[in-house]
Regions:
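Nucleic acid-machinery interaction/catalytic patches
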Residues: 1-440
Length: 440
């Protein structure tokens, strides 16, 4: 019999994996523990919804790893942000309509730039037109994902006493958001964000009215888009459904948790908005956790608690001394070690003068990690998490010099790929066919 059954409690079923734990690894371990001694095909009817295709591939690999050679028929793993109406979790004919195809991102960018030059800014340089197209596209994507339908009031949002360029920008947006849908309609296409939000809304409505009877697990999503949040709520309430949240802080002070709705910069804000009105934080259960070394568990919990306290909203930091004293008094369930010292163990602060020095330092640290095996002889892995794409690419370039190929999630610039360099040289040659520098 399986030791862990996520569908045993009455719905809605909300679970969470601690921030310090490897999310997809624990998710796969929990799914396989639930599978227990059932036949391998028992998993094939299940639908696993993950945030994106990258997570879907990583989860499939984690399942194979934890299966340990056991034969499995894999579940239907689908990216929540890239659903298609003719694929699971949609049943054939469930929607009763065919949505127009989405315009390709590159085509959209150039069509927007052409529209801006032809209809609004004649004589605008191509580079500036593309920049305005990017800004317009990002604005429309945000509105469509948030399902904001009334965009006609944009021009009235800027007060008369503000700068002229603010008013001009608002007027341009007001005209562009009316002209662009007409241009798309003439092409028989729709925006990708609108199509994605529409599919999620249709799925949420269908599963709310007719809950799925098959096994459905939605994991890793924070439901930042309203339609996605409603899909998660429908999955949690389904007879064989559950939602697994990433990194929910279940130990944060209730008084602080209650204030997160007004603090959009806090890391837990998205989870607060998802759970608000749908489930109480106290009702979220811990997901399956594999066996863990007690020392590593205590160190990990100490670090997680310390970081969570460091991220308290500014309005709730007046009692930090009390919090630190409470952490030490609690000593994390009887552990004798100082939890503050435990939480800081292994953390380093490096101060550098320039970005190149930062890239060199990070690359060296990652190389050292990869070349230092675990006590049992197995290899280590490491990851660099940074919002600075340029820094990530600098680190990847330095690692490449040592024969280490980093998997950069942001992708590679076209100019750094062989095909991109070929196109660049061809364009330069066409522009200046007799230029010796272009030929060389």
């Amino acid at each position: 019999m399986a030791r862990f059954d996520p569908f045993l409690p009455a719905g809605p079923r909300w679970y969470a994996v601690e921030a310090r734990r490897p999310f997809l690894e624990d998710l796969a371990a929990g799914v396989l523990d639930w599978l227990g001694d059932h036949p391998p095909e028992a998993l094939s009817d299940a639908v696993i919804l993950l945030p994106n295709r990258r997570a879907a591939r990583a989860f499939t690999a984690a399942l194979s790893k934890h299966a340990g050679g056991r034969p499995l028929l894999l579940p239907q793993v689908r990216p929540l942000g890239d659903l298609e109406e003719d694929e699971p979790p949609f049943a054939p004919g469930e929607l009763g309509l065919d949505l127009p195809p989405a315009i390709a991102p590159l085509t959209r960018r150039f069509e927007m730039a052409r529209m801006i030059v032809e209809d609004f800014r004649p004589g605008l340089s191509p580079l500036r037109a593309l920049e305005m197209a990017d800004a317009l596209g990002g604005f429309l994507d945000s509105c469509q994902l948030e399902e904001i339908g009334d965009l006609h009031r944009i021009a009235t949002l800027v007060e008369g006493d503000l700068a002229e360029h603010w008013r001009e920008s608002a007027e341009f947006l007001a005209l562009a958001v009316e002209a662009w849908p007409k241009r798309l309609e003439a092409m028989g296409l729709v925006d990708p964000a609108w199509r994605r939000a529409r599919l999620l809304r249709l799925l949420a409505t269908a599963w709310t009215e007719r809950p799925p009877t098959q096994t459905v697990i939605a994991a890793g999503s924070t439901g930042t888009a309203p339609a996605a949040a409603d899909v998660l709520a429908a999955v949690a309430a389904a007879p064989r459904g559950c939602v697994v949240l990433p990194g929910l802080d279940r130990e944060l002070d209730p008084a602080v948790w209650a204030t997160l709705g007004d603090n959009e910069q806090h890391p837990q804000n998205a989870l607060w908005r998802l759970l608000h009105g749908r489930a109480e934080r106290e009702a979220v259960r811990p997901w399956f956790r594999p066996a863990e070394d007690p020392v590593e568990q205590a160190r990990g919990r100490a670090r997680q608690r310390l970081i969570n306290e460091a991220l308290r909203p500014a309005d709730a930091t007046d009692d930090w001394r009390t919090v630190i004293s409470a952490l030490r008094a609690d000593a994390f369930r009887g552990q004798s070690a100082d939890p503050i010292a435990q939480g800081l163990e292994g953390l380093s602060v490096v101060t550098v003068r320039a970005e190149e020095d930062a890239a060199a330092t990070l690359a060296l640290m990652m190389r050292e990690t990869l070349e230092t095996p675990n006590p049992d002889g197995t290899g280590k892995t490491c990851a660099l998490v940074t919002p600075d794409i340029a820094l990530g690419r600098r680190v990847a370039a330095r690692l490449e010099r040592w024969g280490v190929v980093a998997d950069v999630s942001s992708g590679q610039p076209l100019s750094r790929m062989a095909a991109g360099r070929l196109v660049d040289l061809a364009v330069r040659f066409v522009d200046k066919p007799l230029d010796p520098h272009a030929l060389l």
